[in-house]
Amino acid sequence: MSHHSSWRGHHCAPGDNNCTAGFKESLGSKNYKLLHVPFHGPTHSHHHEPPHPFPTVDVPDHAHYIIGAVILIVGITGVIGNALVIYVFCRSRTLRTAGNMFVVNLAVADFFMSLTQSPVFFAASLHRRWIFGERICELYAFCGALFGICSMMTLTAIAADRCLAITQPLALVGNVSRRKAGAVLAVVWLYSLGWSLPPFFGWSAYVPEGLQTSCSWDYMTFTPSVRAYTILLFIFVFFIPLGIIVSCYVGIFQAIRAMGKEIRELDCGETQKVYERMQNEWKMAKIALLVILLFVISWSPYSVVALTATAGYSHLLTPYMNSVPAVIAKASAIHNPIIYAITHPKYRAAIARYIPVLRTILRVKEKELRSSFSSGSVSSRRPTLSSQCSLGVSIGNAARANGRWGKKRLSSASDSDSCWTESEADGSSVSSLTFGRRVSTEISTDTVILSPGSSNSTASGQKSEKAHKVVSVPVPSITFETDSADESLSDGKALLLGGN
């Protein structure tokens, strides 16, 4: 009711008591009912509308709608893209290896990140406030923390796997199986769960943030408990994993540089092919690095905001500065499938093979499709580097060129089992393959074999001749041939045994 509007033309002279009394009489219950209009101001009567315990932010409506539209696009892309990654890597036999279990796990974490975060965020943005209650807020924030931490730890495991495959390939032969990869992933999930549960037990809390349309852990409250949780969270799930990733790629850079130098020193026609395979390995390692960098870049703005509030400068942060970095962080779930679709040849070929309707969208050529899958069907009995370089190499040089245990890097993981390589099945998944293998010894037909009689010649003459004559002897190598046409062991992971 507006008193001024109902008595807009009534004026009383100063000191006129009769006029004042008449004005008060007009405000009686009868006139109040006749002049009553809906009042939209604050009121103490809430029996017609349920209370809203969560606060709201005074921002334009279009800000909520824009953020809601962006998060909806991110969610749809993340769900569809990561579902395709999971389907293709589980369907394709050449991609179904122990190392690729890390990639599938990353896609699973990103899939559930998009599935649990985007629809709720979008619905809350349409209502311009949090509408789902306290329990759903806690569950929503818990899922975001769990899947975000799991993605970071999985990327760390991928970097470590790449580093070991390139720097210590022989150490992985027979030591990496699906069971061991599954054990690593179990540790990753338990570690992520351990850092996501404390807010349920009073160490920090899960509360609305930013524009009050999403929830996260409480990093705005300046208390010792909240600050301790935030600081330890960033140390153990962001900075330490990031340091491990950087160390792994520094080791990869150094190993590839050393391998290139050693291969160039070998004057043989096959070294160029080995060098090309090494370049392919480096290319796939760079793709992995790109995925990791995009993930770190996506979470960096959110990290800066949280650490700023933890340092005691939360008054400098606006609702936009809290919500926009949260959207960017959740968008990290879409980088993985997009990068695969653009750069990973075997993934592109598998998509075109199992989902033909996407072949035109990804522009997969027939040549690319044939070349990608032909590598999985060829025999693994390829000539080794030692047998190709046998001519003109002395006994001592043959042992050195064949990469005896002191030269592990020459048998690099150019065809290792991770998704980042050109040839997907290798020695690191030896224990996961079937036992129907044929062990063969390959001996070059161009070698000169000393007869038994010649070995009984004068010892001094033979020693003198061996010291000056360049003799090529066969250096047997053990290669494994699988029963499956799609799973083969590359020569880069064969066990090279130098002959005496």
Curated annotation (Swiss-Prot):
Pfam families: 7tm_1 (PF00001)
Transmembrane segments: 66-86, 102-122, 139-159, 183-203, 233-253, 287-307, 323-343
Cytoplasmic side: 87-101, 160-182, 254-286, 344-500
Extracellular side: 1-65, 123-138, 204-232, 308-322
One cellular component (GO) term of this entry: plasma membrane
SMART domains named among the record's database cross-references: 7TM_GPCR_Srsx
Keyword set, alphabetical order: Cell membrane, Chromophore, Disulfide bond, G-protein coupled receptor, Glycoprotein, Membrane, Photoreceptor protein, Receptor, Retinal protein, Sensory transduction, Transducer, Transmembrane, Transmembrane helix
Gene Ontology terms, MF aspect: G protein-coupled receptor activity; photoreceptor activity
Region (Disordered): 406-428, 448-470, 481-500
Tissue specificity statement from the Swiss-Prot or TrEMBL entry: Expressed in a subset of retinal horizontal cells as well as in retinal ganglion cells.
Disulfide bridge partners, by residue number: C137-C215
BP GO terms, sorted: phototransduction; visual perception
Glycosylation sites: N18
InterPro entries named among the record's database cross-references: GPCR_opsins (IPR050125), GPCR_Rhodpsn (IPR000276), GPCR_Rhodpsn_7TM (IPR017452), Opsin (IPR001760), Retinal_BS (IPR027430)
Primary subcellular site in the record, as a coarse category: membrane
Keyword Cell membrane part of the UniProt annotation: yes
Residues with N6-(retinylidene)lysine modification: K330
Family annotation (Gene3D superfamilies): Rhodopsin 7-helix transmembrane proteins (1.20.1070.10)
UniProt subcellular location: Cell membrane
Polar residues composition-biased segments: 411-428, 448-462
Topology relative to the membrane: Multi-pass membrane protein
Similarity comment: family membership: Belongs to the G-protein coupled receptor 1 family. Opsin subfamily.
Function: Photoreceptor implicated in non-image-forming responses to light.
Name of the protein described by the UniProt record: Melanopsin
Protein source organism: Rutilus rutilus
Chain's gene name: opn4
